[in-house]
Amino acid sequence: MCGIIGYIGRREAAPLLLNGLKRLEYRGYDSAGMAVLNGSMKMLKKKGSVSNLEELLNVSGTVMLGATVGIAHTRWATHGDPSDRNAHPHMNVSGDIALIHNGIIENYSALKQELMGEGYVFESDTDSEVLVHLIDRIWKNDSALGLEGAVRQALRHVEGAYGICVVSSREPDKIVVARKGSPLVIGLGDGEFFIASDAAPIVEHTNKVVYLSDGEMAVVTRDSYTVKTIENVEQQKRVTELDFSLEKIEKGGFEHFMLKEIFEQPEVMRDVMRGRVRVEEGRVHLGGIHDYLDRLKQAKRIMICACGTSWHAGLIGEYLIEEFARIPVEVDYASEFRYRNPIVSSDDVVIVISQSGETADTLAALRLAKEKGAMVMGICNVVGSTIPRETLCGMYTHAGPEVGVASTKAFTAQVIVLFMLAMALSKGRTISQEEIKLNLRELAEVPDKVAWILEQNDAIKEIAVKLKDARNALYLGRGYNFPVALEGALKLKEISYIHAEGYPAAEMKHGPIALIDEDMPVIVIATRDNTYAKILSNIEEVRSRKGRVIAIASEGDREIERLTEDVIYIPQASAAVLPLLTVIPLQLLSYHVATLRGCNVDRPRNLAKSVTVE
């Protein structure tokens, strides 16, 4: 989510670090900062763009002259609002250790309380600051450890994901780095080394890199680097020679950001669940709503307001909450909610969903709900945006920056958050502990199942060839898969400019069936659930009118093959998690149809990423 760049060599560090941060801007961020060593530690950090940091550097950068070692960071907030004090790097109390961190420290709260009990003072609201104080404490208790040993011991206390760079004026000629679940790469130069979260800020300086693996750390000096495991076992690493352009590296080697973001979903799903889903305990921990959970459980009704793809996620949330928590749910387009004079009371909970947290219609719905006395909670991806500031409580999706205008990973992240919410609302009320445990186990298996679906990318592209010249398309689903049909149709419309409609499969005969002929592709979500037999009947109705059927079906279903032109298989799963699987082939199908038609999939015409006007 964030960007890391480090340098050690013989050149001025600050300009190199600043340029590296500019190369990392594509990742999305809310603040930036750097720390360098030139006898003592010097640090600058600023909320907002890298250009804000550059202005600060131009004014006070003389203090950084002569520094040839440094680290810098662009932050995407996960704990604590975007602000100067929450920006990285973070320093220990004495100002001789600085650290930058990507990832989430799951047990930071317990560690923070422990450190505060020993007199440590925290300057920020971040989870990352815990690490620098932990390293400081360990090193003070045993000075023989050195920086490397102190970092190693500190990481043994940490639960969660991290990619870190640490420097200290006590040992000014090295950078110590480590990773677990958050990528780091070392660039090998001549008498200099670069460390980064990806190759984008490195490639203009060297094409020789070493990628760290999970559970590894490295000590980097001007002349050498050593890689070891956290357990202190030395590793021999292969040097990779890059042949990518800068633009391609920014896209992770993918042709478009949208495809990159589709393929990021297994890891994003793990990030959303990390520290929240406790499978063996049969519970979820949702810190953002923990203090309000009893009030949420007492709601007479839940109303969900959203726009576009977030509205489709809200529909799935309706199914989940009603099935498991047995609380009535209504889902409104935010743009309609405010104009229909809705009946809302203090007994209601209104959930607003927005990737950006700035969607104008959703903000208007939020404010109306508050005026009418409802409890309002938010589901949002961008920390510090307007929705989390104006709602009583809420949950972040932790999907990371989404560059492509057509939402993919933000949608699946929202659905997972709603699934976790349904489990939290159900606990102790409507379903047993064992059932919650089974549901959470199903949810925890989803990332691996999505990875399996993504392996069919080439086969899905072949199917897209048959659809690229269509003028219209119909998407059908039932139950949990009806909102997925809506989302699949929206994706095709957004990026390929082919008219498409999503319908509940049974509603086909109430109008859309009149449109079906040999030129009409019909994409049917036909998974093995309690609506399977009915879906097969709907497919027969399409076939009898010469419609071209493409099915999304459960692995091992051979019966479906005789009824369809093409089948895309997904792994078996319970109905409640199926939307997280069935949407993936529809995202890929839309992407490939659009690219085959020569469309700009990352920036489709007439659309904006965040709709901030009504």
Swiss-Prot record:
Signal sequence region: none
Subcellular location, record wording: Cytoplasm
GO cellular component, one term: cytosol
Residue ranges of domain SIS in the record: 292-431, 463-604
Domain Glutamine amidotransferase type-2: residue ranges: 2-223
Alphabetized NCBIfam families for the sequence: glmS, PRK00331.1
PANTHER family: GLUCOSAMINE--FRUCTOSE-6-PHOSPHATE AMINOTRANSFERASE, ISOMERIZING (PTHR10937), GLUTAMINE--FRUCTOSE-6-PHOSPHATE TRANSAMINASE (ISOMERIZING) (PTHR10937:SF0)
Subunit structure as annotated in this protein's UniProt entry: Homodimer.
Protein name: Glutamine--fructose-6-phosphate aminotransferase [isomerizing]
Provenance organism: Chlorobaculum tepidum (strain ATCC 49652 / DSM 12025 / NBRC 103806 / TLS)
Organismal lineage: Bacteria, Pseudomonadati, Chlorobiota, Chlorobiia, Chlorobiales
